[in-house]
């Protein structure tokens, strides 16, 4: 029982714990009269690498503007409206200024659950509505609370030792592969991802969503949002995989240790999934969605409750014709 408890804690640590670019443009169009476009839009000084949409925050990890991504109909996502990131616990005054002045931030969606939020509360930004949309299935939350797993950051004492110890355990390796399927098939998670999509549709200003490290649960939120906006599978996968660039140094260092200890590919993949993201597991779960629900389009409508009409309104609000 003790080992099982520790296995659960280890696997959950990661879950609690960076395309195509065209041009910078504001999203003002005749179909979006109810929405006041962000002005001024972010400049290259506020997007460190415009082709990758990385935002230079001081205290917020893994932050990206979703602008510039090309949808299947040729339109692009507007810059200055949609941001994905890690938690806002250490957001600095300069970070807040960017979110207020450049993004006109009105809404933050937090995919973490109550214990995570109580251990590491977001910085409160004046005028912003915070909405909790926990997308960790309840059965995993209960296990995590029972065994007292923390936020799962690599800076937590002993976390690296635990990761290295269980990287070689086939049972844990297999458990990691099941995390994404559990999330996308859980009714509570589906309901909250649907709530997130409707929140993005209804937002009066810029929107930011995050979990702990901004990679797994936020990655799925971004995937569903991009799918609703009309992105191809390739664009969705590439955006999800970009989080690996944010954590590449840590992944490479720990993977090297695993190889030095004669660990096989299963152990290396475990480190990749826990510290970065497993794009392999992500794609396998996209396949699962197609197999179990018919298609991503049907999943959005039937599981997340986001209709075709909702999707058309979302596209009118956040897409613009390419220059």
Model-found features: residue ranges?
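Non-catalytic accessory regions used for complex assembly or targeting
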Residues: 13-14, 18-21, 32-37
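Ser/Thr-glycine-rich phosphate-binding loops at phosphate-binding pockets of nucleotides
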Residues: 213, 217-218
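Catalytic nucleophile loop of clan PA
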Residues: 210
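N-terminal non-cleavable signal-anchor helices
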Residues: 9-12, 20, 163, 175
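C-terminal motif of bacterial Sec signal peptides marking the signal peptidase cleavage site
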Residues: 22-26
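Cys-dependent protein tyrosine phosphatase-like superfamily
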Residues: 27-207, 220-323
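Bacterial N-terminal signal peptides that target proteins for export
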Residues: 1-14
């Amino acid at each position: 029982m003790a080992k099982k408890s520790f296995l659960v804690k280890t696997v959950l640590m990661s879950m609690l714990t960076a395309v195509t670019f065209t041009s910078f443009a504001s999203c003002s169009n005749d179909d979006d009269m109810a929405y006041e476009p962000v002005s001024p839009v972010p400049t290259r000084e506020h997007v460190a690498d415009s082709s990758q949409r990385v935002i230079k925050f001081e205290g917020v990890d893994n932050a990206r503007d979703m602008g510039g991504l090309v949808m299947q109909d040729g339109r692009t996502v507007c810059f200055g409206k949609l941001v994905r990131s890690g938690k806002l616990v250490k957001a600095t005054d300069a970070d807040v200024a960017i979110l207020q002045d450049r993004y006109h931030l009105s809404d933050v969606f937090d995919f973490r659950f109550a214990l995570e939020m109580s251990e590491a509360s977001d910085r409160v930004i004046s005028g912003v509505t915070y909405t909790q949309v926990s997308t960790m299935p309840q059965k995993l939350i209960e296990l995590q609370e029972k065994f007292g797993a923390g936020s799962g950051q690599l800076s937590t004492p002993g976390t690296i030792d635990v990761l290295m110890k269980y990287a070689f355990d086939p049972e844990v390796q297999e458990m990691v592969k099941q995390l994404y399927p559990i999330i996308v098939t859980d009714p509570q998670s589906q309901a909250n991802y649907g709530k997130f999509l409707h929140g993005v549709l209804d937002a009066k200003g810029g929107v930011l969503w995050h979990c702990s490290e901004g990679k797994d649960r936020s990655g799925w939120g971004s995937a569903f949002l991009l799918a609703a906006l009309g992105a191809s599978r390739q664009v969705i996968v590439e955006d999800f995989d970009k989080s690996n660039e944010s954590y590449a140094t840590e992944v490479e260092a720990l993977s090297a240790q695993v190889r030095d200890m004669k660990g096989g590919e299963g152990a290396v993949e475990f480190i990749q999934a826990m510290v970065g993201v497993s794009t392999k597991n992500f794609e396998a779960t996209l396949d699962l969605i197609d197999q179990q629900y018919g298609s991503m389009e049907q999943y959005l409508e039937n599981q997340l409750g986001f209709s075709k009409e909702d999707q058309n309104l979302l596209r009118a609000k956040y897409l613009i014709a390419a220059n």
